[in-house]
Amino acid sequence: PANRKFLGFTVSKQGARIKVADKAIEKLKDTIRELTRRTRGHRLIDIVRELKTTLTGWKAYFGIAEVLSPLREIDKWVRRRLRCYAWKQWGSAGYRELRKRGVTVREAWNTSKSAHGPWRLSQTPALSLALPAKLFRQMGLPELAQARAA
C-alpha cells in the first residue's frame, strides 16, 4: 500500500511526508462536537477553555505533522462551530449582539431575520465580523496549523 497508518499518523511513500491520519481527525472532530453542542448552556469563554485543553494536547502529540492543510481546515471548522454556538446562545437578541459588535444595520438585520439555521448562518460575513478569529485567539483558543519555529 502507498500509505501507512501508524500511531495516528499517515506516512506516504511519495515524498515521505507525515500527515495526521483521517481517523484521528474524525475522533478529534467528534470530541469537539461533544464540547460545542448547542444545548450545553455554558458561556462561550468556558467552551473555549475546555477546547483549549483538548486542542493543546492534540497539538502537542500531532505537532510533528508536515502536511498542515487538514489542520488549517480544522481550525476554520472549530471557529465556525463556536460562531454557531454563540449565535444559538444569543437567540432573539442576535440582532442586538451583532450591532454591539460593529456589524452594519443592514447586515445584522438580514442575518437575524434569515430563515436559515445556526450552522448556515455561522459562515455569514456578519458573524465572521462580529466574532473574528482574533477574538478566539484572545480568548485562548490555540491554532493547530500555527507555523512552527524551525
Can you name each region flagged by the protein language model?
Residues 1-150:
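Non-catalytic terminal/accessory segments
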